[in-house]
Amino acid sequence: MTSHTTAAALATLGAAGMVMLAGIAHAAEIRVIGSPGTRAPYTRLVPGFEKATGHKVVTVWGGVNDVAKRVADGETADVVMLPAAQIDGLIKQGKLIPDSRVDVAKSGIGVAIRAGAAKIDISSAEGLKKALLAVKTIAYSTGPSGVYMADLIRKWGIADQVKSKIVPARRNVPIGVMVAAGEAEIGFQQVSELLPVEGIDYLGPLPPDIQETTVFSAAVHKAAGAADAGRALLKFLTAPEAAPVIRKTGMEPG
């Protein structure tokens, strides 16, 4: 997608938002807490929402497990954004409003190496398996992509062989940043989280036969102080006009 096309999509979205949200009379501050899986499209879309509505969006990012635990333990916000499984869990716990739940975007797992490093064959599952056995260090997140990679390694029967190669993920540090710094030879994370990172070569997504797609969802907190504005934000993020912006970041609309 060209920058002109992206700008046009944002302009259209802003115009749509003006009509869609015209019924909201007073500007509010919306507190959002979430994991960074949707950060790339979210940060492109939110300014248009703020311009269209006058609302101010304040966002706090954290790891999937960290954010889910904080909300489960009583932390409040207006909107919570996490992988679908965590959102559904918090709804079951009575923390989030069920009928406010939306799927915002979805992403597969990508693979990256340090910029300039020798390319690795990830075109097939067998090629990727051989790569993991050959490299000295491996990094993956503590979120859904990392859980999946750990399971995949176990299914391949190479967990014992690569155990000493796994570099623990650092809190709130993207895997791409660790790879760029040379902390790991190869890294795995959501495509949308790898693409913005400088200092890495993005090799592409996992082969189709072993790919895992994570759906990122959001819902309004039951204790929200700006529930109506929060619902309006979710409507904006999931409007058809948002789709081109979401795709630009390597994700698909939810």
Go through the PLM ranges and name each one.
Residues 7-8, 63:
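Hydrophobic alpha-helical segments, principally membrane-spanning helices and signal/leader peptides
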